[in-house]
Amino acid sequence: MENNLENLTIGVFAKAAGVNVETIRFYQRKGLLLEPDKPYGSIRRYGEADVTRVRFVKSAQRLGFSLDEIAELLRLEDGTHCEEASSLAEHKLKDVREKMADLARMEAVLSELVCACHARRGNVSCPLIASLQGGASLAGSAMP
């Protein structure tokens, strides 16, 4: 299949791109993928460039780019706008680092709460539940 990616029906195209047909239609509605002309009395056909474009979208999504950001990257895809693409990637990297810092804070708080749960004795209420109910400030410190 890899060696002949021209003149594909939407089902074969979706399979070649590693997505389902509804994803193809969704990308078309969002303007991420052009809908090919439909010859009179026939069906639309897709080619290798379409497969490449969908793979681009999926790769960008795996890196955390939103569909709007991907649309902007696609606008720059001729390769001559490296500075603009780099700027978008730097912004995404900043977002990822902020999320990682938030996750590290959440991990620290949850770890502390789990330890507190294991250390509790007797009829003392659960520190995790108490924290989530506002009885302690630990849970609040996990979120920015």
Swiss-Prot record:
Hg(2+) binds at residues 82, 117, 126. This is Mercuric resistance operon regulatory protein. PANTHER family: MERR-FAMILY TRANSCRIPTIONAL REGULATOR, REDOX-CYCLING DRUG-SENSING TRANSCRIPTIONAL ACTIVATOR SOXR. Mediates the mercuric-dependent induction of mercury resistance operon. In the absence of mercury MerR represses transcription by binding tightly to the mer operator region; when mercury is present the dimeric complex binds a single ion and becomes a potent transcriptional activator, while remaining bound to the mer site. InterPro entries: DNA-bd_dom_put_sf, MerR, MerR-type_HTH_dom, MerR_fam, Tscrpt_reg_MerR_DNA-bd. The keyword Repressor applies. It comes from Pseudomonas aeruginosa. Changing residue 115 to A: Slight increase in transcriptional activation. GO terms for biological process: response to mercury ion. Residues 10-29 bind DNA. GO terms for molecular function: DNA binding; DNA-binding transcription factor activity; mercury ion binding. Keywords: Activator, DNA-binding, Mercuric resistance, Mercury, Metal-binding, Plasmid, Repressor, Transcription, Transcription regulation, Transposable element. It holds the Pfam family MerR-DNA-bind. NCBIfam families: MerR (TIGR02051), PRK13752.1 (NF010315). SUPFAM superfamilies: Putative DNA-binding domain. It comes from the Bacteria. Gene3D superfamilies: 1.10.1660.10. Residues 7-76 form the HTH merR-type domain.
